[in-house]
Amino acid sequence: MLDIQLLRSNTAAVAERLARRGYDFDTARFDTLEERRKSVQVKTEELQASRNSISKQIGALKGQGKHEEAQAAMNQVAQIKTDLEQAAADLDAVQKELDAWLLSIPNLPHESVPAGKDETENVEVRKVGTPREFDFEIKDHVDLGEPLGLDFEGGAKLSGARFTVMRGQIARLHRALAQFMLDTHTLQHGYTEHYTPYIVDDTTLQGTGQLPKFAEDLFHVTRGGDETKTTQYLIPTAEVTLTNTVADSIIPSEQLPLKLTAHSPCFRSEAGSYGKDTRGLIRQHQFDKVEMVQIVHPEKSYETLEEMVGHAENILKALELPYRVITLCTGDMGFGAAKTYDLEVWVPAQNTYREISSCSNCEDFQARRLKARFKDENGKNRLVHTLNGSGLAVGRTLVAVLENHQNADGSINIPAALQPYMGGVAKLEVK
């Protein structure tokens, strides 16, 4: 959520920055709401002053024996009380309308974010590693994976399209990847591992920005009988739960940064993705991801963003996977992000790079919703900055390992860093 004080003091400048990311901020509507709010507040203050003044007179009038005048004054106070209740209701209505609108407004892009309308205008930062040149006709991860235990038909039979069953060697490799990622982040990068719920309420999703704007992308869960029925949601990412661990809290500054990680399934309806990536693991309704979240001092957040990108890169380097880093342009950034880097891994069968990690600095956008604060050196409570990043998407990493490390006979070489998590197995072979 944007800072309302910033909106009030720099409306035109905020509107201009939002326009950079394709959002048309209605300044006339904002001005109208602000005028209504100010009018009600002025009326409330005038009524309160009048009530206080008349209340002081009542005692004096009674002391002078002027009972009729005292009663008239008491009647005035009673009417003012009624008027104040109405003014409070009017102010609450204006504030609710303003708050609901603010929840739908995206974050302001950082000044360093390149301008652009969509993904075609993202900017490449660097490429790392050289895509392998194969001397045989390569297969995609579907043809490689099915003989090793990747079962798309089984997933569809159980749950419908975009679900997958893994068994045997593929299931073990998938698990090994997640464990390797967690160990790297906790033992080398200093994150604390968490296990968090996979089902959350709407307040939790509102805190990180998925609600109210992106309800159609979420899986709903209903529980209870007719009288106690409640709606909750399957998490689309562990960013939601990890970031919400600091909601409604004041963190001592010496405890910052907080570095949190979790391995979880992620559930997404993929609304609007009909017809995209219908083959294989690239776009699933359920997939695993190892998430990184950092809660930091505001002055450290952009330094931290670069650090988190490096943490995700370390996984790709260890797995010997070619990749590139791109800066998302203003028109392609996520709703809550002020700046985002995507890491894209080379997928040989598609002859292109595909997103495998997204690392974002949300600045204080989420923290304002969450009331996540820290106490600075002067004893003042300030909003923290929150950052999140994939470290990495496990299914897409599996795709990359299968395709980049394949052999002509359909076997898969296991990267050396991953072999301890595979019981020393150096190659997956069709049995």
Curated annotation (Swiss-Prot):
EC number(s) stated in the UniProt entry for this protein = 6.1.1.11
Query: Where L-serine is bound, by residue?
Result: T237, A238, E239, E291, S390
Q: Which PROSITE patterns match?
A: AA_TRNA_LIGASE_II
A Pfam family: Seryl_tRNA_N
Task: Kindly list the GO molecular function terms attached to this UniProt entry.
Answer: ATP binding; serine-tRNA ligase activity
Which pathway does the record list? Aminoacyl-tRNA biosynthesis; selenocysteinyl-tRNA(Sec) biosynthesis; L-seryl-tRNA(Sec) from L-serine and tRNA(Sec): step 1/1
The reactions it catalyses are:
tRNA(Ser) + L-serine + ATP = L-seryl-tRNA(Ser) + AMP + diphosphate + H(+); tRNA(Sec) + L-serine + ATP = L-seryl-tRNA(Sec) + AMP + diphosphate + H(+)
Q: Does the keyword Isomerase apply?
A: no
Q: Does the entry feature the keyword Phosphoprotein, yes or no?
A: no
Q: Give the source's domain of life in one word.
A: Bacteria
What Gene Ontology terms for biological process does this UniProt record contain? selenocysteine biosynthetic process; seryl-tRNA aminoacylation
- Name the enzyme group at the top EC level: ligase
* Keywords in alphabetical order: Aminoacyl-tRNA synthetase, ATP-binding, Cytoplasm, Ligase, Nucleotide-binding, Protein biosynthesis
Binding-site list for ATP: R268, S269, E270, E355, I356, S357, S358
Q: Which InterPro entries match?
A: aa-tRNA-synt_IIb (IPR002314), aa-tRNA-synth_II (IPR006195), aa-tRNA-synth_II/BPL/LPL (IPR045864), Ser-tRNA-ligase_type_1 (IPR002317), Ser-tRNA-synth_1_N (IPR015866), SerRS_1_N_sf (IPR042103), SerRS_core (IPR033729), tRNA-bd_arm (IPR010978)
Question: Which compartment or compartments is the protein found in?
Answer: Cytoplasm
Q: Which GO terms describe its cellular component?
A: cytoplasm
Membrane spanning segments where? none
Tell me, what does this protein do in biology? Answer: Catalyzes the attachment of serine to tRNA(Ser). Is also able to aminoacylate tRNA(Sec) with serine, to form the misacylated tRNA L-seryl-tRNA(Sec), which will be further converted into selenocysteinyl-tRNA(Sec).
* Free-text domain note: Consists of two distinct domains, a catalytic core and a N-terminal extension that is involved in tRNA binding.
Quaternary form?
Answer: Homodimer. The tRNA molecule binds across the dimer.
Q: Which family does it belong to?
A: Belongs to the class-II aminoacyl-tRNA synthetase family. Type-1 seryl-tRNA synthetase subfamily.
- Annotated protein name in UniProt: Serine--tRNA ligase
Gene name tied to this protein: serS
